[in-house]
A protein has these predicted regions:
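N-terminal loops that bind phosphate or other acidic moieties
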Residues: 2-336
Length: 336
């Protein structure tokens, strides 16, 4: 997908969202019913395999090329004391990723998947949303295009993750702006390790929402979002335009895509939500977008960890779909 020249192009793309192949989906459902098992007995694994058939336009979907994209950014709102860790940890963790020492490195190695780390202007945090917009239109466009550029059109699957001290505060602010309700219901601890920090986050978000009042989806992303959130938005949009399925990680990734959902409620139909984070707002956000997570493992790490674990569920679905024999091929009697 080519980079955007202006934000208004997004509205044109939303009107042209490609859809899964319904004919293939129907054939895939019938194919599943011919495999040597009671119909529906593999549960969500069957749904996943049919999902991939529809998006890949084939009865034999594959995952030969998987991209795991981790976007990193820093946030001006950290100046408000919403975190227990200094912002320098973002750069330090990016270095840890590059040196192979993080959880996501081990999960990618275990799954034989290449990991791409994409830091975005870490020495220049976004503006503090407590006082005004995080970004202007030019900055937002640059970051969205970074996400778009990261998606390889030959990929079979995109796994998304993030790193950024302060971005759970950003995710809560975006979610509240998108769907409303009590701020406290959207705010979890993140890396805040005491009640005072949690209260501080709620107070900061309340003020930030009053200062940044615009509720049009792209304005929400621009005024309240971070650079990594904008890049995730861009990568998600690019994947949709290329009909590439996506596995989303936790709360921050989901919140990054929420403005896209508001633009068109079907815009995330190519996305699998890998898990439900322990972050308080994630369960509510998934419900607001009518999405069901594959896993619930009490994970709240970020960095794509939950999504990468979910990848193994997806792979299990496809190996069963592609490898199982049919009743007819092995002479086993089917149900009547």
């Amino acid at each position: 997908m080519q980079k955007l020249k202006c934000l208004s192009e997004i509205y044109l793309l939303i009107e042209q969202l490609p859809k899964p192949n319904q004919k293939i989906i129907k054939e895939a459902k019938n194919y599943q019913n011919q495999l040597t098992k009671p119909q529906g007995s593999l549960g969500i694994l069957e749904d996943l395999s049919i999902f991939f058939c529809g998006w890949q336009n084939t009865l034999k979907p594959s995952l030969k090329k998987i991209q795991t994209l981790i976007f990193a950014g820093n946030h001006g709102v950290c100046n408000q004391g919403v975190n227990s860790y200094p912002q320098s940890v973002t750069s330090e963790m990016v270095l840890n990723f590059k040196n192979g020492g993080a959880a996501i490195n081990q999960l990618c190695n275990h799954s034989s998947v290449n990991l791409q780390i994409i830091p975005i202007d870490l020495d220049n945090p976004t503006n503090d949303i407590y006082y005004g917009p995080a970004m202007n239109e030019t900055e937002l466009l640059v970051c969205i295009n970074i996400g778009i550029k990261a998606v390889n059109k030959k990929s079979d699957l995109i796994v998304l993750g993030e790193m950024g001290i302060g971005n759970s505060t950003i995710a809560s602010a975006i979610s509240t702006a998108c769907f409303g309700g009590s701020i406290a219901k959207w705010v979890g601890r993140g890396t805040a390790n005491n009640d005072n920090k949690l209260s501080k986050k709620i107070s900061v978000i309340r003020k930030s929402l009053k200062v940044n009042k615009k509720r049009e989806p792209l304005k929400i992303l621009m005024t309240l979002g971070g650079r990594e959130q904008a890049a995730i938005f861009g990568a998600t949009l690019a994947a949709r335009m290329l009909k590439i399925p996506v596995i989303m990680d936790g709360f921050i990734c989901s919140a990054s895509a929420a403005p896209l959902f508001l633009l068109d409620n079907s815009s995330l139909d190519h996305c699998i939500f890998g898990h439900c984070s322990m972050e308080r707002g994630h369960k509510l956000l998934l419900k607001s977008m009518n999405k069901s997570p594959l896993l619930n493992l009490n994970i709240h790490l970020g960095e794509g960890s939950g999504a990468m674990i979910a990848l193994n569920i997806v792979r299990s679905a496809l190996v069963c779909h592609n490898g199982m024999a049919s009743f007819e091929s092995v002479g086993v009697s089917n149900s009547k």
